[in-house]
Amino acid sequence: MKKVYRSAARMSTLLLFAAVAQMSMAQNTNTKDKSNSKEENNRNVMLNAASANGPREIQIGLPSADVNVLENGLPVTYATNPHGVNANWRSDASLSRVGLLKISETAITTGNIGYAVNSFTQLGQEGFHGQLQYKTNHFGLNEMSLNLNGGMGKGWYYSANMYQDFDPGTFELKSAEMQDRTQIYKLALTKRYNEGRGEMTLMGRYSKSHPVYTYATQSAPFIYVGDGSVQEYGKFALGTTSYLPTDPSMTYRDMRTGELRTTTMYDAAENNSKEIALYNTYNWDNGLSWKAALRYDNARGAFVYQTPMSLINLPGSKHGYIQQDAMGNWTPYTGDYVQTRMSCLNAGDIDELLFTSELSKRFSQSTLRLGLNQWYYHIDYASNTTMYDQSVPVDGSYPVRLVDSKARNSYFYDFNKNASEYYKGHENKLALYVTHDWDISPKFNLYYGARLEWQQLKGENAAVRNASGYVGRFADYHLGAVAPDGTRIVPTKLDYDWINYDFTAAATYKLNKQMGFTADFTYIVQHPRFENFSPATLPNTDKIVVPLGRAGVYYNNPWMSLTSLVSFISKTNNNSTLNLQHNSEIMAAPLTYDIQTLGWTTDVVARPVKGLEVHALLTLQKPTYKKYETSITFSDGYVGQINATGNIVAEVPQVIIEFDPSYQLTRSLRLWTSFRYFGKTYANINEAYYFNGRWETFGGLNWQVNPRLSLGCTVVNFLNQTGAKGSIAGAELITKDQAAGIKNVLMTGSYLRPFTVEISASLKI
């Protein structure tokens, strides 16, 4: 389970329905074009303000879960912790198409919640073809991908792909050369059947990735002014200054064996994957079509986090913090602040075998589809955590590690005390789904479907109980350790069988050629996934219910398409863990809560004059916590309590605006911009701290030099906005009354991606 170190259980940072797509385009087209009816349009999937190389995460007002990315009908990774999508997939020259599946289609075909990036591998074609893509930026990024494909005769085709990423990030690290070093290789061999009846493809993939950015860009210090704005701390420039110590080494206690080990953060973050897949499609003359996809993946997934915890304002010189100088001598630390950090070394060995099969039949006015998922996932996972202290340099120099000589004689302490995790075993999902897309009349279309899923989970974790309840974590916690009360930490057996189900229905009525009504409803019933069993407690295993309803109108004319929808979504039994902080003590508090969001979205695409296209979206929403209560008793007897029921969900804005104009200057030159406004967001669960609204801006020029060569220039954050976003470290227990008098105080949190100029080129061979 992705651990929650900040407020709101790592809540989605965007909206309820900023991702409500321009449905009117699908509604005024021929409903027999079913390839588009399952996908959303105008979502700029790869235009990402948070990452230079990953897909944009389109949120729906619920806690952040797995990022759904499919390739050839199968999830790129079964679970994204510890094996992230970016470690095994990039939107590069190896893909023939990238789209976005609707929430209803994602729910029925995968059982997951939210939109899904839908991608397809570039397979071989007749003759010889190739594409070379290259991207760089003014910070020194070098990203390239190459696809070569062609025919081999007698219906056989090949496709070979290579992806390389050398990304130093937006500031120089001393502990690693690159913030992202990723390499992905694919090889596909295709046999096409006679008379265009289909094809069979055998594909292999190897990937290796070091996502250093997951910990290098996680936090930075800033001055919280008190009015929702922040100021930079001294010469520490947000986004272009490193907040990591120069020493890359990390000492930790192995959760499985209890041994003390040393590694580097770069090595701990290594992901690798070796997979083989088989895809088949076959079409009969009677409108019957069969698709099947089978993939086996053997992988090591890993994430490293360097989470800021306490920020200590030192009382003059009466402290025991010391640092080592260049000669190895220990000297008193003379800075004003000390940052305590928790290192989380998440890693797991993974084997997954995924199979999906679909049989569809086209009739004169409808398409019927029957599908099967058989997904098996085995993992041996542990998260080893350790604490250390570092300086907070006001001059923008690199932080150094510190030792509190009054408490210890080494850098690292509290091994596995705060957020260590362990689980081992397998999860299996066997599901049957059916959909029917029916043009009842020229004016009325009805789409409906259902999914029935058997989820089996077997294995073990470290949720150990004593007479008083769960033992929980403690310093030097690991399998085989003995708690202060004498309880031995031994694996707890897990064995669950659940029935999950989803159903969806969508109706579109065309009042006339220009205007109509649309409504859809999706109801999802799930149970916890294996990663929810990672903490030292068992999660709430009651069913998780997600109802989603939308209704609205659309209007189309030759120069404009408009859709306006009201929406409702909720989710019960969100399992989460908060790391609550009191003085210098940090304790984990598990909780289960509900969320509910009401929203209204209007989406417009207009072409008022030749060459000009404008896309605009406005979302107003109210995401609120329901039954959000927890408490924890610290060692000094203080009881930390949180009751956020009725509060606005942290990190989620109530106002979203998107404005995307583009203009075709000539037949070969296109100028475009993209503006996204995110309104005021709360930076902790109690609505005590907040950040003012912010703009994310992009702009660029695309030049089609000739049919083979295209060039592009993109500017990220061209308004050069700097500041903080997300949540504030260690602020979970702060109330509104306590925060009222807090002004011009140093805090740590996440920040905006800095001004970046990117140059790209694509050459068709």
Segments (PLM) and residue ranges:
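Acidic/polar loop-and-plug regions of large Gram-negative outer-membrane beta-barrel proteins
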Residues: 190, 199-277, 302-344, 398-418, ...
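Structural signature of Gram-negative outer-membrane beta-barrels, strongest in the C-terminal barrel
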Residues: 348-352, 362-377, 382-386, 390-408, ...
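Extracytoplasmic beta-strand/coil segments of soluble accessory domains associated
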Residues: 29-75, 102
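Short acidic/polar hinge/loop motifs at secondary-structure boundaries
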Residues: 57, 74-102
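Repeated loop/turn-to-beta-strand initiation elements of outer-membrane beta-barrel proteins
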Residues: 129, 155-158, 195-200, 287-290, ...
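C-terminal beta-signal and adjacent terminal beta-strands/loops
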Residues: 27-29, 677-682, 703-765
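Gram-negative outer-membrane beta-barrel transporters
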Residues: 442, 559-561, 565-575, 588-685, ...
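Transmembrane beta-barrel wall of Gram-negative outer-membrane proteins
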Residues: 129, 136-166, 171-243, 276-279, ...
